[in-house]
Design a protein with these regions (language model features):
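RNA pseudouridine synthases
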Residues: 2-326
Length: 326
């Protein structure tokens, strides 16, 4: 059911020179800047009685604002008592270390049991923040650090920081193949043309940039540290598959087990039982959305990746005399 919302306000003199969408986000803090921008583009905002349809247009101060919109009532997700590993919290943000097998947001096939449901239980006021404060996501079986906004102003500023590439996200991963050097993958990503749940490199996709460097070599695998410039769905997984080095365990993008020649039964078993993409969000750095202070968090790789890497090291040591690139 749609709800009619009518809002009025006057731009203050202190807002002189601000963008229209920025000024309105301050005047109407109960609504996100992205939603206000949609209203502007939909010509639902009147500035001194005339349609204001340019989000980047500057305000002078003193303008009378009138907004008349209908808002579809959002689906009501239920709070659920799901444990969250919280590594930092203040009045404005949460940083969590997400485990494997946990979806971030409800969707097709996952109506509940998500990070969002857990947030609603842990901090009920977050229900008033768009998407319960979730500003970026990790795949279901990717582990590691995520920041969540507890208030609308914090959410607005974090979204802006992501768009401006001011938030640094670094990952650890294990890729298939012997990689000789680090590098950058700069290839656009879009939905796969025939597989609805897959992504793919495509010339008409959205820009995507992934930087990577080598941390450790194994016989036919490589441990990597990666940094995202952009945050497309499945970005690291798609980019590494595109350069023929899919992540270990990533059966969607070609990471099925490939034991090296002469591998022990123990190592073959370790590879086969690792049933998720070997990817962990290990570092998060950002400017606090309210105080502006630079903050940084680290999360060590989880036990399943520790055991995988230890098995690869043992295999490497057992066969290093036979490796021709040493």
């Amino acid at each position: 059911m749609a709800q009619r919302v009518q809002l009025t306000a006057t731009v203050t003199e202190n807002q002189l020179g601000q963008r229209l969408d920025q000024a309105l986000a301050e005047l109407f803090p109960d609504y996100s800047r992205s939603r206000i921008k949609e209203w502007i583009l939909d010509q639902r905002v009147l500035v001194n009685g005339s349609i204001g349809d340019k989000p980047k247009g500057k305000v002078l101060g003193g303008e009378h604002i009138a907004i008349d919109v209908e808002i579809e009532e959002e689906a009501r997700f239920q709070p659920q008592d799901i444990p969250l590993n919280i590594v930092y919290e203040d009045d404005d943000i949460l940083v969590i270390n997400k485990p494997r097998d946990l979806v971030v947001h409800p969707g097709a096939g996952n109506p509940d049991g998500t990070v969002l449901n857990a947030l609603l239980h842990y901090y009920p006021p977050i229900a008033d923040v768009p998407r319960a404060g979730i500003v970026h996501r990790l795949d279901k079986d990717t582990t590691g650090l995520m920041v969540v906004a507890k208030t609308i102003p914090a959410q607005t500023r974090l979204v802006e920081s992501l768009q401006l590439r001011e938030i640094t996200r670094e990952y650890e991963a294990v890729a298939i193949g012997h990689m000789t050097s680090g590098g950058t993958v700069e290839e656009p990503i879009s939905r796969h043309p025939t597989k609805r749940t897959h992504m793919a490199v495509h010339p008409m996709g959205k820009p995507a940039v992934t930087h990577y460097r080598i941390m450790e070599h194994f016989r036919i695998h490589t441990r990597l540290r990666l940094r995202l410039e952009t945050g497309r769905t499945h970005q690291i997984r798609v980019h590494m598959s595109h350069i023929t080095h899919p992540l270990v365990g990533d059966q969607v993008y070609g990471g099925r087990p490939r034991p090296p020649k002469g591998a022990s039964e123990e190592f073959i078993t370790a590879l086969r039982k690792f049933d998720r993409q070997a990817l962990h969000a290990t570092m998060l750095r950002l400017y606090h959305p309210i105080t502006g202070i630079e903050m940084e968090w680290h999360a060590p790789i989880p036990q399943d990746m520790v055991e995988l890497i230890e098995a690869m090291r043992a295999d490497f040591e057992a066969h290093k005399d036979d490796i021709d690139w040493l």
